[in-house]
Structures are given as C-alpha cells and as structure tokens.
Amino acid sequence: MINKNLRKLKFLLIKLFRIKENAHNVSLGFTLGFLIHFIPSFGMGPILSTVGAKLFKGNPIAGFISGVALIWLFPFLFYLNVVVGETLFPYGVFPSATGMPSHGLDAGIHLGAVFFIGMIINIMLFGMVVYYLIYTIMRKYRLSFLTIVKKWEIKK
C-alpha cells in the first residue's frame, strides 16, 4: 500500500517537474489548484483546479496535478477554516438578528460566517506561502530533482 502511494507520488512529481513552462506559470497553476481545496467543491476539485489555473493564466496541468494529488487534504483544510475563523471572531462577536425564534439558527449563521472569514484568510495566507515555495523549488531545484529521480527506485 505504501509502495503504491510512493509510486503515485513519484509519478506526479515527475509530471510536475517535467512541465516545459516557466516557473511562474507552473507555480501559479499549482497554487490555484491547491487553493481550491479550501472551498467545498463537492467532488469537482480537480476540474475546478484545472479551470482556475487556465482562467488566471497559470499552467492547467500543474493545477490538475495539485488538484488530484492534494485532494485528501480537504477535511483538514475545512477544519482549519473553522478554527481560524473562530479564533479571530469567537461566538458572540457577530450581532444576532432581533426577533429570531431559534438559537440554533443563530449558531448556524455564526458558523457559516466564521467558516467564510477563515476561508478567505487561509486562501490569502496559504496562497502566498505555497506560491513562493513552488516558485523557489521550480527555479532552483528542478534540474537536480529530475536527475535524482532517475536513481530513485521504489520496490513493487
């Protein structure tokens, strides 16, 4: 099982580093593909990653690779949105609507607002960090990584 996942990782890394475009376009596509996972996309993440990368003039292949390779991160990123939003705006900060008959509705509206604010903050923060990391890796380590990959053997 682990060897199968390592082979998939190796394949996706090779595909990413062999893209014949400049580092900016590849890192932009990868970053936009990654940022889709902060938004609930209901199974459309890889498609939205590709379309988003193409729309913002990034590399759509890099967007698809990050959309497929990092789809398992969605539950953690969803929870991170709620945690960041709740840290910045704890319960009781948003004014409740007057005359609301249910306390549950108030809590649901608060949770939605907290999630949305956390999502916006996380997208901006992680967008800058991931773009910088991928750009640096593509500029400095692309060729050396591709020569190392030739020697990288994973047992079946």
Locations of the language-model features?
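Transmembrane helix boundary and interhelical junction motifs in multipass membrane proteins
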Residues: 38-52, 56-79
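Membrane-spanning helices that line or support transport/gating and their immediate boundary helices
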Residues: 79-83, 87, 132-140, 144
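Transmembrane alpha-helical segments in integral membrane proteins
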Residues: 117-139
